[in-house]
Design a protein with these regions (language model features):
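Long, contiguous binding/interaction regions
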Residues: 1-175, 179-180
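Catalytic-core regions of core metabolic enzymes
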Residues: 159-893
Length: 893
């Protein structure tokens, strides 16, 4: 059985799952524990507990329970009514009220109702139970209320679910922050497996904690010694007389399970499990980790690891060095998540050499529980973190990660390296869309792009971008001035800028005139500005002051190549004085004597100019930061409420095909579904026998397109399965000839279609293919016969909005074709964007759709819309199943 892990407001976990008959004894205990006031709030009157029990165990459409320590602490039910409405009822144990549990269960049930096509949700609430009404409103549901005798009936439409998801993510942030605080801001720590031997992991970790002067209590646990490194030791966690917030576990894996149980009994809030020997070693370790997970979930404990390096918080409020490396990090304003423990050791050394200090560091290991989703929400509000770095090897809940990251990257940059170049794992695909997306890293790119995350290919690039954003303002545009004392280096910088999407514009005439007045006659004041090798150090300051006043540039690359006559310290001071004069209004980076990082001579009085060893490195880092700036400074997106659609009819079509063992929907089924989602198609007649063609097209005028469909017919033009401009009067003869030709070559033809000819337009593609982890991926781009050859497409994870669709189109190399290229008519780009958004909604609401292919979509002249003239939909039970939006993850319970 599966369930959902829910984070309460205090950061602890509970499990929510379906109620089953064997839970009867648990539900009896739950009812017995309820106060009269709680019962009255749920049932509008004081009700005998026998009647409460009967009501709660009644077999309803959907009944869920929340558990902590194997005891039921909340109950929720969805009651299906007539005419498309459903009723929700929730009751929470007195001890767990006002912790966000009722709100989470409400979200779970509301999402289930939405998936089932419910058009209105109702709940009868006691007038005194204002918390229920407040919860609905706070989640963003458009709530209406109506007074009834002794009760208030509240109702809301699931169409406001997108806003509810966003609001719940904001509420969920507090829970995630409180959970991470267990680990990064503990008041007391136990180290189980602490040792006096500093060559052991437990010994070095305990030494690091002591040496960091941790601002709290530290308790070593070792059954074999009275003292560890001079501190009184305890034989067991249970022997410690004081509360323990976090326990570091550094014992063999088979012992760690027993220790975790003892920590739960002790009331420990979180475990940092350094120990290896879990899922990373195979089946035996996976079973061990599953056992560990059950124990921690039972007690509501949170976990970092197992198989991790530990955690660091360099804040003066905490002073926590809870990791086993002999290296120490310097204090700074960057926070780092590493999924690799070994990499973490190197990070301390690299960041110190680059002059990049760390605010905090977390090695998540196998990510049993605490993951990037939790940590980035903590760092979002951490006043000591300016830049977030992520080294990821896998994703747990990428859909939720994307939603959270979209919010955070508007405030702080997130820079990520995703190792392994994830292979999307699409099943054997048979459509144009599937072929474009199969076996690629495109899912990760799409996730990062639409979340505002800066993706770098290497750790070296990550630190280049980090040193820039940690020390300079985010660029407000892509216009770059290059100031150099060596012409060749300036040309290299200019080439690299333009190769990575930056513009090196001609400077304003007034700027060039000012530069001519101060620079040698042989200097070039074009952009790049070559001051020449013989220039004096003070020319850097004067030139930067002039460039700082030029509003036609956004960033400056300053290059210094060491000549014999200049002292680098003098040049550095000159650069700092120049930068100081324009007060962070522009982003400045330097290429300073092949120096990398944040060198001491380029920092003074709060002004810090990062240095790169080569012009290309500076340009690439600046380009990444500029792309992020475009995201950061873009206006917030409005969430449009979705119009209701006949979801039940769509589900009926899909389930009917699956029941019949069919993967591909028929043309008529596809056409019906597309119509329900307002995706325009052409006038069509379907037939199985050419004799039917004349009957089905009786009364049609002009010419038609004739097409054949079958399981192996994908690229119709390649096999003679499409003929255009067929006179209606000759449709039977043409259909006969096409059918005979296909069958003679071994193709099975299931049916044929005749379509009205669409006026001339631009052939585009719109489609989706489902990934088992990331969900449906939406694709848009140039379509037609050459789609797989050109591969000029853009992708996003569903769902998308109109702004996302606009960005997708802008990313196409051939975007200008839609915009009146070389005097052609401007196409209806808005209509095409609507198609992409509606495709996104269709596949999001129907995860059984494995592939959807609209190719081509003919985009007509502006104002005339567009038409999908060929389409295919493949369905299956193995489609993407996203965790509920209120859940941290799906659990096996």
């Amino acid at each position: 059985m599966t369930g959902s892990s829910i984070i309460l407001r205090d950061g602890s976990l509970v499990v929510v799952r379906d109620y089953i008959d064997s839970d009867l004894d648990k539900i009896k205990d739950f009812v017995d524990s309820l106060s009269d006031a709680t019962i009255q709030g749920r049932f509008m009157q004081v009700t005998p507990k026998e009647a409460v029990l009967r009501a709660l165990i009644k077999n309803e459409w959907k009944t869920i329970i929340a558990l902590r320590n194997d005891k039921i602490i909340a109950h929720g039910a969805l009651y299906k009514g007539n005419e498309g409405f459903a009723e929700i009822g929730i009751i929470v144990s007195d001890n767990f009220q006002s912790m966000g549990l009722g709100t989470a269960m409400l979200g779970l049930l509301a999402e289930e109702a939405v998936r089932s096509g419910v058009k209105e949700i109702r709940s009868f609430v006691s007038p005194e139970n204002y918390k229920m009404i407040s919860a609905l409103k706070s989640m963003g549901f458009a709530v209406e209320s109506e007074a009834k005798p002794g009760a208030v009936m509240v109702r809301f439409s699931p169409s406001s679910l997108p806003e509810a998801i966003r609001n719940f993510d904001n509420r969920d942030s507090l829970s995630a922050i409180n959970a991470v605080k267990f680990f990064l801001e503990p008041k007391s720590i136990a180290v189980i497996g602490a040792s006096s031997d500093r060559t052991s992991i437990g010994g070095q970790l305990f030494f690091n904690l002591l040496e960091s002067n941790f601002n709290g209590q530290i308790f070593p646990v070792n059954p074999n010694h009275e003292f560890v490194q001079g501190i009184r030791a305890y034989k067991s966690i249970r022997d410690i007389e004081y509360p323990v917030d976090v326990a570091f576990i550094v014992v063999p894996a088979d012992v760690a399970i027993k220790v975790a149980e003892e920590c739960g009994e002790k009331g420990v809030k979180g475990l940092v499990i350094i120990t290896s020997g879990f899922s990373e070693i195979g089946d035996v370790g996976k079973k061990r980790q599953e056992q560990l997970s059950r124990i921690c979930t039972k007690y509501g404990m949170r976990v970092i690891g197992p198989n991790c390096m530990g955690v660091v918080n360099n804040s003066d409020r905490v002073r926590l060095n809870g990791q086993f490396s002999p290296f120490k990090s310097i204090k700074g304003r960057i926070s780092f998540l590493s999924q690799s423990g070994a990499l973490g050791i190197a990070v301390f050394d690299i960041t110190t050499r680059l002059g990049l200090g760390l605010s905090s560091f977390v090695s998540v290991g196998n990510k049993e529980d605490i993951s990037g989703n939790d940590l980035i929400q903590y760092w979002e509000n951490d006043e000591e973190t300016d830049v977030i770095l992520l080294y990821l090897e896998s994703f747990g809940n990428p859909v939720k990660f994307s939603r959270i990251a979209r919010r955070i990257t508007k405030k702080k940059p997130i820079i990520a390296v995703k190792s392994g170049r994830y292979k999307a794992g699409f099943r054997a695909t048979q459509s144009h869309t599937g072929a474009l997306l199969a076996t690629s890293d495109i899912t990760v790119d799409a996730l990062f792009k639409q979340s505002g995350i800066i993706r770098t290919d290497t750790l070296d690039e990550m630190f280049d971008v980090a040193v820039l954003l940690a020390n300079q303002p985010v660029p407000k545009g892509n216009r770059v001035a290059i100031l150099t004392n060596a012409g060749g280096a300036g040309i290299l910088a200019a080439d690299a800028c333009e190769a990575h999407g930056l513009e090196v514009p001609d400077l304003k005439e007034s700027t060039k005139e000012e530069l001519r007045k101060i620079l040698p006659d042989i200097a070039s004041v074009k952009n790049p500005i070559d001051m020449t090798a013989g220039v004096q150090a003070e020319m850097y300051e004067k030139s930067l002051e002039i460039l700082g006043r030029d509003d036609s540039i956004d960033s400056i690359i300053v290059i210094f190549i060491l000549p014999v006559v200049l002292d680098p310290n003098d040049v550095a001071k000159s650069i700092l004085r120049g930068v100081k004069k324009f007060n962070n209004s522009k982003t400045v980076v330097s290429v300073f004597m092949a120096t990398k990082g944040m060198t001491e001579i380029l920092r003074e009085d709060g002004i810090r100019v990062p240095s790169f060893p080569f012009p290309e490195d500076a340009a690439i880092a600046l380009a990444r930061a500029t792309e992020y700036g475009k995201w950061k400074y873009s206006p917030p997106k409005e969430i449009r409420k979705r119009e209701s659609v006949d979801l039940e009819k769509v589900k009926a079509i899909i389930s009917g095909a699956m029941r019949d063992g069919r993967e591909w929907l028929t043309y008529d089924e596809c056409s019906t579904i597309l119509g329900i989602y307002n995706i325009p198609t052409v006038k069509t007649a379907t037939f199985r026998d050419p004799k039917e063609a004349e009957l089905k097209t009786a009364g049609w005028q002009g010419k038609v397109a004739l097409k054949a469909y079958g399981p192996k017919i994908v690229h119709k033009s390649d096999v003679g399965a499409v003929e255009l401009n067929v006179p209606v009067s000759k449709i039977k003869d043409s259909a006969d000839a096409m059918l005979s030709g296909l069958r003679s070559r071994g193709f099975q033809v299931d049916y044929m279609v005749a379509q009205e000819m669409v006026p001339e337009g631009i052939e585009m593609i719109a489609g989706s293919s489902s990934d088992p982890l990331f969900g449906p991926l939406v694709v848009g781009g140039m379509g037609g016969k050459l789609v797989e050859l050109l591969k000029d497409v853009s992708t996003r994870l569903a769902p998308i909005d109109m702004e996302d669709a606009a960005e997708m189109i802008s990313e196409l190399k051939t975007a200008d074709v839609l915009r009146g290229y070389r005097g052609a008519k401007v196409a209806d780009e808005e209509a095409y964007k609507e198609v992409l958004v509606n495709v996104s909604r269709l596949v999001s609401e129907n995860p059984e759709i494995l592939e959807l292919d609209l190719n081509p979509v003919i985009v007509l002249e502006k104002g005339l819309g567009c038409k999908a003239v060929d389409f295919r939909i493949r369905v299956g039970s193995q489609g993407f199943k996203a965790p509920p939006f209120v859940a941290k993850s799906i659990l096996n319970v």
